[in-house]
Amino acid sequence: MALELKIRELETTRLLLRPLELADAEQTQRIFPHWEIVKFLASVVPWPFPADGAFKHYRDRAIPAMERGDEWNWSICLKSDPGRLIGAIDLRRTHNSNRGFWLGLAWHGQGLMTEAAHAATAFWFDELGFPEMRVSKAIGNTASRRISQSNGMKLVAFEERDYVCGRLPTEVWAITADEWRSHCARSDGNSGRPTSRL
């Protein structure tokens, strides 16, 4: 597997996913700290979210993990407004939790995260070469569940996990590289398929 592969910009029909930078913390801090965004995130996210929370998270955890090759983090922007961050998505080698994301409230309900998740999943399989992706989500997180379903994933296990809102029953969804490629072939040109931005 080409785990040493550098992160690069991804493009979908409506989105640019650009590698996370420390400078993104300011925009993140403005749109991230809302209960509807954070409640189903892992309990390591502090709540109430501190005024320097995004900066410290990017400086102390996300960017070092990218430099080690343990994570691949992108800021999400609309092609129509490429300087404005609207969310983030990451890939990581953590057991049962290989992909995570959040999206600003103003952009919910438009299918944007489904598009971003498709692009990141393609990168996971086609460029990083992993054999399987697993994602965890609280049972009440129906929006995230729909994204896993639309990406062709299957429910494979149940467990309990700690979230910002407390300890909750959790679903584990998974898809193999072969299943992913079959899903993409059936989808016939899914709008989230990434294109190169070198």
Please identify what each model-predicted range represents.
Residues 65-69:
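Soluble sensory domains of the PAS superfamily and closely related sensory modules
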Residues 1-40, 73-198:
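Acyl-donor (CoA/ACP) binding surface of acyl/acetyltransferases
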Residues 38-60, 72-74:
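Conserved GNAT-fold acetyl-CoA-binding loop/helix
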Residues 60-64, 123:
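A generic secondary-structure signal
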